[in-house]
Structure formats: C-alpha cells, structure tokens
UniProtKB/Swiss-Prot annotation:
The lineage of its organism: Eukaryota, Metazoa, Chordata, Craniata, Vertebrata. Zn(2+) binds at D186, E226, H351. Belongs to the glutaminyl-peptide cyclotransferase family. Gene3D superfamilies: Zn peptidases. Pfam families: Peptidase_M28. Disulfide bonds join C167-C191. This is Glutaminyl-peptide cyclotransferase-like protein. Keywords: Acyltransferase, Disulfide bond, Golgi apparatus, Membrane, Metal-binding, Transferase, Transmembrane, Transmembrane helix, Zinc. It comes from Homo sapiens. GO terms for molecular function: glutaminyl-peptide cyclotransferase activity; zinc ion binding.
Amino acid sequence: MRSGGRGRPRLRLGERGLMEPLLPPKRRLLPRVRLLPLLLALAVGSAFYTIWSGWHRRTEELPLGRELRVPLIGSLPEARLRRVVGQLDPQRLWSTYLRPLLVVRTPGSPGNLQVRKFLEATLRSLTAGWHVELDPFTASTPLGPVDFGNVVATLDPRAARHLTLACHYDSKLFPPGSTPFVGATDSAVPCALLLELAQALDLELSRAKKQAAPVTLQLLFLDGEEALKEWGPKDSLYGSRHLAQLMESIPHSPGPTRIQAIELFMLLDLLGAPNPTFYSHFPRTVRWFHRLRSIEKRLHRLNLLQSHPQEVMYFQPGEPFGSVEDDHIPFLRRGVPVLHLISTPFPAVWHTPADTEVNLHPPTVHNLCRILAVFLAEYLGL
C-alpha cells in the first residue's frame, strides 16, 4: 500500500501533458508600412496553430475512428426537477436495496451469488423492461481458478448510444478469522443508488424506450474489483477487464462494437460516508463534472438537500490528489470517456471492518441520489 492511496498503485492513466503556451513577442515599435502584413501573418499563424492543436489534442485523447459526441442538454424546469426528486424513496433505497447487499460477498462465495441473483431479480422486475445479461467467467487468481459474474442491464439494447453507470458489487477478501467485511461504502451504497435510480425513474425510462430515444441508460454491476491477495495488474479488476474485452468484440449498430456505444462511463465508488469530496479526474469529461456541481448548487438553493450547509460541498474545483486504479481503467484504455465519482480522500472506514451500515451518513447518501437523479433526467431528456 502506498501512502495516500487506495492500496492501489497511483498511476496517472488517461492524462496527457499540456502544451506550453506560446510566448508573446517582445513589444517594440514597428514601421507603419509593415504593420498590416505582420498582423495578417500572425492571424494566419494563429488560426493554423488553433486547428493543429485541436487536431493534435483529439489524436492524443481518442483512439483512431472514435468520436466524442457532445450532447446538448438543458436544465430541468423547477417543477419537473421537484417531481424527479420527489419520486425518490429514501426508505426504499435503504431497506429494499441497500440492506440485502450488506453481506460478505467475496468472489465465488455464497454471499456473492446471493447478491448477484438479487441484482438480476430486481432489474428484471422493473416495468421498463430492462435487457438483463449475466457475464459469467472463470479467471486464474493467486488463489486458483475463481468464478466471477458481471450483471449488465441495458434499457434499450437497440439504442445507438449508452450512458453507462457502473459500480462493483464484490467485497474485499480478508484472512480467515477476520471480522466480516461488508463494504458498505465499498461498494454496497453505489449498487443501491443505481437500483433506486432505475426504480424511481421507471416510468420515464419506459417512455423513453418506447420513443426509441437515441441514448439509453445502461447499468453495470461488476464482480472482482478487489484484489484477492495483493493489488496488481493480474490481481484486480477481474470483472471490468473481462467485460471491457468482451464488449470490444460484440458488434453493435451503428457500430462497430458495444464498447464504442458507450457515450459516457460513470463509475461510482466509495460513497456513503459523511462529507465526501469529488474532483474531475479527466479533462475530457470535465463538462459533466461541472454539470453535477451545478445540480448540487441548484438543489441546495431550492432546499432539496439535507445536512448541506454550503452551496457546494461535494463537487470541488481543482485537481485530484492523484489518479486511482479502479474499474474504469479497462474502459479508459479503450477510449471510453470516463467520469469517476470516487470520494477522495477515501473514507476513514475504507478497507476496515468499520465500513458498515452504522457508519454511513444517510443524508449524504440521499443527497447524492437526488443529484444523480436530476443528472440522469437532464442527460437522457426524461
């Protein structure tokens, strides 16, 4: 484990160096007759540099043949916003969705299978008619072969583009005899948030599906995020590595593959402790981070957030302390735009037996659910 980290190597993945700004020319007095040609030359040079730098930036950030669409979305009218927030049910989130997840659910364990079946059954019960798939596989681990299974739910698999929300549902393995670790923030709460969002927006999502909206919602519940022995490239991210590779090979119309249908990949992790702070990890998706920040401000001004004394508490400006290896990495490496919603610094209960329901902060959980619900409604035009 490295200081200040998540027990994971702090690699600056997905980042690029910034080009040095052009130095302004030294000021001097020029003959009047040469001024116009010089200004024209500077204008042409500036235009050329702007075009070149924009092209160069795109070639650094995007793999060949991949384009980044920038959807035009508007803010919800206040009445509609209040209706969306009012459809969320804090009691349902906590009792119906969160508590069944608060069990030991290490990969290959009975608890892991129990939670996987719960996720599948819950998603299949929604009236919007989600297309639910299981991605089972066996992987070699330091403990020998282990069975894993990702749950993939797509509202409308025929849609051209996907807004993908993801989290991991496995819990970290501790030595025999250790206090049971249920990973409330890591990542039972993110899983419960996704289920509550899908249920609360069920009618709106059903309507969007019937209207064949070009962008649909996709939910990924990933297995095997945690290392089974010691974090490394071959002992971590089992589910996301397998699923990203699989999605890269499955055709999707208009194509070419499922992974290229992902318009934005939002990964939720380490949520539920009091006073979380989030930072934008990737310049490519900073506009969506700013959108979440704006929604937090707006909900605060409308008195729709609890235990929220300041206008902005969660979505902070500035640089994160460092990059974190998490389930977004296999997708990021394939050119998928990533918005990483992980609390940094990590919660004090991280990877300790204290990461339980009693140490969660319900107002924070419900506030994040409201912010995400408004974000989904605006992004998808619900």
